[in-house]
């Protein structure tokens, strides 16, 4: 049994070798000749999987170690009788922590408290729900918009997108990319929406590039609209609009979900799905794969305020470390993908063990996802 895996999927060689012969290949472009005798294909979001790639090939199963699936023609796979699995929620925590790292940086730079801001969350799935929970644990007001969930009657106080635009100081997008249909998200943030944002608002896109109309956004910024922008995703990736990058406050190469934990979850989820598909079901404990974190433990004295939280968050991950490298190489062919391929290891907040002498600080840090314990000062 031959299994092709994206060369940038961590732990894929070790895990899938339990099930068959593993060949690691680049994801963009994928070497088509390797598909001629392969039984399974494991990809990331950079690989378009459709009829033109797989027609006439012996592939029986496709797995994507990503939460999003807009790079997969699921309808064709089903029609062709090819098994499929994604990894929903695998990188949700990573994306939430990327948003926090960005917001805390902007708050420090511009001198505001997050408690004074209302956050509008567009898309309330695995990422949106976790973001809502962590913001509300800090006492920050959130507004939710998710028309598909609202129409299904899912639990939640859902508002219209127009209401979020009117009332939110921060608008952050966490939707799939739907190019048509009743819940179309292509250019959901169009020129009209962008121009309608509150003066001084913060716009964040960490889902799919085309959810925000990049041309319209650049037009608004060039005209001097007072707006802070955080973009992790771009229309036309791996190409991007260099002029837009110059105008945004934070720009990164589609790495919001790139924690070691998130990548490992993605790999293990598709591994478990494929093992079940072939009748050799196996389960993997994530902590058996992950290395020891760089920072073992730290001690925190006193209550948890915003500057202290910012220091803790940026100790684990400071978004500026990914902004600067992109600006250095933007516009050079191949460099966007190279930054992703050679991405510096990044951990989640749970990897940081925090000893607190303040019980409320320990409790709040646990709610936020840190590994925190209370030890009273002596």
UniProtKB/Swiss-Prot annotation:
It catalyses: 4-phospho-D-erythronate + NAD(+) = (R)-3-hydroxy-2-oxo-4-phosphooxybutanoate + NADH + H(+). Pathway: Cofactor biosynthesis; pyridoxine 5'-phosphate biosynthesis; pyridoxine 5'-phosphate from D-erythrose 4-phosphate: step 2/5. This is Erythronate-4-phosphate dehydrogenase. Keywords: Cytoplasm, NAD, Oxidoreductase, Pyridoxine biosynthesis. The lineage of its organism: Bacteria, Pseudomonadati, Pseudomonadota, Gammaproteobacteria, Enterobacterales. Pfam families: 2-Hacid_dh, 2-Hacid_dh_C, DUF3410. PANTHER family: FORMATE DEHYDROGENASE 1. Homodimer. Transmembrane segments: none annotated. Catalyzes the oxidation of erythronate-4-phosphate to 3-hydroxy-2-oxo-4-phosphonooxybutanoate. The active site is at residues 208, 237, 254. Belongs to the D-isomer specific 2-hydroxyacid dehydrogenase family. PdxB subfamily. GO terms for biological process: 'de novo' pyridoxal 5'-phosphate biosynthetic process; pyridoxine biosynthetic process. Coiled coil: none annotated. It is an enzyme of class 1 (oxidoreductase). NAD(+) binds at residues 146, 175, 232, 257. NCBIfam families: PRK00257.1, PRK15438.1. The keyword Oxidoreductase applies. Its EC number is 1.1.1.290. Substrate binds at residues 45, 66, 258. GO terms for molecular function: 4-phosphoerythronate dehydrogenase activity; NAD binding; protein dimerization activity. It is found in: Cytoplasm. The keyword Oxidoreductase applies. One of its GO terms (cellular component) is cytosol.
């Amino acid at each position: 049994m031959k299994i092709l895996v994206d060369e940038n999927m961590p732990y894929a060689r070790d895990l899938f070798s339990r099930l068959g012969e593993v060949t690691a290949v680049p994801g963009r472009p994928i070497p088509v000749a390797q598909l001629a005798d392969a039984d399974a294909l494991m990809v990331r979001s950079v690989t378009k999987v459709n009829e033109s790639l797989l027609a006439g090939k012996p592939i029986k199963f496709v797995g994507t170690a990503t939460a999003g699936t807009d790079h997969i023609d699921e309808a064709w796979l089903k029609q062709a009788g090819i098994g499929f699995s994604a990894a929903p929620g695998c990188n949700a925590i990573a994306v939430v922590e990327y948003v926090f790292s960005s917001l805390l940086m902007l708050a420090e730079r511009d001198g505001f408290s997050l408690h004074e801001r209302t956050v509008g969350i567009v898309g309330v799935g695995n990422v949106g729900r976790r973001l809502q929970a962590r913001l509300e644990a800090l006492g920050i007001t959130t507004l939710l918009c998710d028309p598909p969930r609202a129409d299904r009657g899912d639990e939640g106080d859902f508002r219209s997108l127009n209401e979020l635009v009117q009332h939110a100081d921060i608008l952050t997008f966490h939707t799939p990319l739907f190019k048509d249909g009743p819940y179309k998200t292509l250019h959901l943030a169009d020129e009209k929406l962008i121009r309608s944002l509150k003066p001084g608002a913060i716009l964040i896109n960490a889902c799919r590039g085309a959810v925000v109309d990049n041309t319209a956004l650049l037009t608004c910024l060039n005209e001097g609209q007072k707006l802070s922008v955080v973009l992790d995703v771009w229309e036309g990736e791996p190409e991007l609009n260099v002029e837009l990058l110059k105008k945004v406050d934070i720009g990164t190469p589609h790495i919001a979900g790139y924690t070691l934990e998130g990548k490992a979850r993605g790999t293990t989820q598709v591994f478990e799905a494929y093992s079940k598909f072939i009748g050799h079901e196996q389960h993997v404990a994530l902590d058996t794969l992950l290395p020891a974190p760089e920072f073992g433990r730290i001690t925190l004295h006193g209550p948890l305020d915003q500057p202290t939280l910012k220091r803790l968050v940026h100790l684990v991950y400071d978004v500026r470390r990914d902004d600067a490298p992109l600006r250095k190489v933007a516009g050079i062919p191949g460099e966007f993908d190279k930054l992703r391929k050679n991405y510096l290891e990044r951990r989640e907040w749970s990897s940081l063990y925090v000893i607190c002498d303040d019980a409320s600080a320990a409790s709040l840090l646990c709610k936020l996802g840190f590994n925190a314990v209370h030890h009273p000062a002596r």
